[in-house]
Each structure stands twice: as structure tokens, then as C-alpha cells.
From Swiss-Prot:
Pathway: One-carbon metabolism; methanogenesis from CO(2); methyl-coenzyme M from 5,10-methylene-5,6,7,8-tetrahydromethanopterin: step 2/2. Induction: The first gene of the probable mtrEDCBAFGH operon. Keywords: Cell membrane, Membrane, Methanogenesis, Methyltransferase, One-carbon metabolism, Transferase, Translocase, Transmembrane, Transmembrane helix. This is Tetrahydromethanopterin S-methyltransferase subunit E. It is a multi-pass membrane protein. It catalyses: 5-methyl-5,6,7,8-tetrahydromethanopterin + coenzyme M + 2 Na(+)(in) = 5,6,7,8-tetrahydromethanopterin + methyl-coenzyme M + 2 Na(+)(out). It comes from the Archaea. The gene is mtrE. The chain crosses the membrane at residues 4-24, 60-80, 87-107, 140-160, 161-181, 234-254, 255-275. One of its GO terms (biological process) is methanogenesis, from carbon dioxide. InterPro entries: MeTrfase_E. The complex is composed of 8 subunits; MtrA, MtrB, MtrC, MtrD, MtrE, MtrF, MtrG and MtrH. GO terms for molecular function: tetrahydromethanopterin S-methyltransferase activity. It comes from Methanothermobacter marburgensis (strain ATCC BAA-927 / DSM 2133 / JCM 14651 / NBRC 100331 / OCM 82 / Marburg) (Methanobacterium thermoautotrophicum).
Length: 295
């Protein structure tokens, strides 16, 4: 088979895995209030809003997912090389162990944060904590499995691949990357639209309203299940598309045009994206104008 066709097939598989991982990563951060919106949740009791929202951020998303993916990649690497387990099985076991560590940190972090807010009469809802562990572990498993999988594909002895870095290091690097993409792409949608639903959309989140979050859902008290259901319609898929496009566009040009041609085509793509982003922003500003205060 033509090496270029083989390489493009691997790149397509990597892009698909990255798309799934990106969507799951954003939804996991939404169900657990990780990264940017996290500070708004932990300020809510101080603003007089007692809530039933998970608040489990151990750290920022890049550091957290670099850790989870590094654990999964290290376990898979050992199982594949020491015990000669099949690749899929080794990666799955690594992702399960990473999900267990992830869940443990989620429990201790959430309980620690909520207990620290007890001086503001914020209770610890054990039923809410237990019910949300499944989505946290499940989405985390999908992210680490897909991320370690695309990292493994980079090490295949195929022209354009055969990366010199070992699998655990690649998994850490891609984990940091997917955490950064989820933090910069999906969290803006979550923080602006769902946590501050009582404010007009488009006005941003000024410091004066930090912690003044929405605590009532369409029926009953709002919890993180409501948030992740809402974000699955737009924020999650958008994050998956962003990460999938980054992975695909980072490899296909080298496979098709070679090293030198790939660098040149990559620069052209970056310039086109900058121009497109500028045109889109100018159009939006001219079409809708600046945000106006109510008179």
C-alpha cells in the first residue's frame, strides 16, 4: 500500500480520536466545575447562594489532564512492553486506573472545598457527589483512552510518524494540550451562558458579579447534570472539533508535502486562520455592535 495513503489513514484516525477526546474533556470539566468557571462556583456561598454543583477542580485542566493521561500512558507502556498485552487492552487498563485516580482526587477536592465554605452555611450533599462520580469517571476514561491511543499512533513505524518520544511522555504532552483546548474553548461557553443565565448574554462576566450564579433549574435546584446536558449541545462538540482540527492539521500536511512543504503549508494555514478570525470578529462587531447597558 502507498505509504502516503497509510499515513493519511492514521492521521484520520488520530483526528477522530482527538475529536471524541476533546468533546469528552470539555463535558467532564463542565460536570465537575473544573478550570475557569470553578472560581465562580466556590464564590457562590459567599454571595449567599447555596448550591448543589460539583466543585472538584484539583488544578487547571492542562495540569490535570497531563497527569491523568500520563498515568494512563505509563501503565499502558509497561503492560505492552513487560506483559506483551494487546495495545487496546493495555490502553484500556491504563485509562481505567487513571479514571480511578481521577475520581479519588475529585472526591477529596470537592469535599475539601465544600467543607471550607461551611462558615457560609454551605452543606455537603452526599447524594449529589455520588451521582456525579459516574459522569466524571466516564468522561475522564474516554479522554485518556483516546489521548493515549493517538499518542500510540504517533509511535508507529510509518513514514511521517515513528516519534522518538516514548508513549508516556507523548501522553503527558497531549494531555496538557487537550486541557488547554478545553479550558480556552469550552469553558467560555459554560461560564458565560449557564452559570450566569440570569444576566443578558454577551455582556461578559464582570468581577462585580463573580459568584452570583444561577442556582435554580427549570425544575428544582440546579446541579452539574443540568450544566453538562446543556453544554453537550454546543460547548462539548465545539471543543472536540477544535482539538480534532488541531491534531489533523498538524500531521496531514507533513504526510502530503513532506517536512519542508509541510512547514510552508502550515504557515499558510495559520495565516488563513488569522485572517478568517479577524474578518469574523469585524463582521460581528459591525453587525451587532457593542454591548449596551439597559437604560
Amino acid at each position: 500500500m502507498d505509504p502516503m495513503i497509510t499515513g493519511l489513514g492514521v492521521v484520520a484516525l488520530m483526528g477522530a480520536a482527538a475529536t471524541i477526546a476533546g468533546a469528552a474533556e470539555d463535558l467532564e470539566s463542565d460536570v465537575g466545575s473544573q478550570s475557569n468557571p470553578n472560581s465562580q462556583v466556590q464564590l457562590a456561598p459567599q454571595m449567599g447562594h447555596l448550591h448543589r454543583i460539583i466543585n472538584k477542580a484539583v488544578s487547571g485542566e492542562p495540569v490535570a489532564y497531563g497527569t491523568w493521561c500520563g498515568i494512563a500512558g505509563s501503565v499502558a507502556f509497561v503492560l505492552m512492553n513487560s506483559m506483551q498485552l494487546p495495545v487496546i487492552m493495555a490502553i484500556a487498563i491504563g485509562a481505567v486506573i487513571a479514571a480511578m485516580v481521577h475520581t479519588t482526587y475529585a472526591v477529596t477536592s470537592h469535599m475539601g472545598r465544600i467543607v471550607s465554605q461551611s462558615q457560609f452555611n454551605q452543606p455537603l450533599f452526599m447524594d449529589m457527589l455520588v451521582q456525579h462520580l459516574g459522569p466524571i469517571a466516564g468522561h475522564g476514561f474516554i479522554v485518556t483512552f483516546c489521548t493515549v491511543g493517538l499518542s500510540y499512533l504517533m509511535t508507529l513505524p510509518i513514514p511521517g510518524f515513528a516519534h522518538p518520544f516514548p508513549l508516556p511522555l507523548l501522553a503527558v504532552l497531549w494531555g496538557i494540550t487537550i486541557g488547554a483546548i478545553g479550558s480556552s474553548t469550552g469553558d467560555v461557553h459554560y461560564g458565560a451562558e449557564r452559570e450566569y443565565q440570569q444576566y443578558p448574554f454577551g455582556g461578559g462576566i464582570p468581577v462585580a458579579i463573580h459568584g452570583d450564579i444561577t442556582t435554580k433549574a427549570e425544575l428544582g435546584a440546579r446541579n452539574s447534570m443540568d450544566v453538562v446536558h446543556f453544554c453537550a449541545k454546543y460547548g462539548g462538540p465545539l471543543t472536540g472539533f477544535a482539538f480534532g482540527a488541531i491534531v489533523f492539521l498538524s500531521f496531514w500536511n507533513t504526510i502530503v508535502f513532506g517536512i519542508t512543504g509541510g512547514i510552508i503549508s502550515g504557515l499558510i494555514i495559520v495565516l488563513l486562520l488569522i485572517i478568517l478570525n479577524n474578518r469574523l470578529e469585524v463582521f460581528a462587531r459591525n453587525r451587532y455592535g457593542p454591548y449596551k447597558e439597559e437604560e
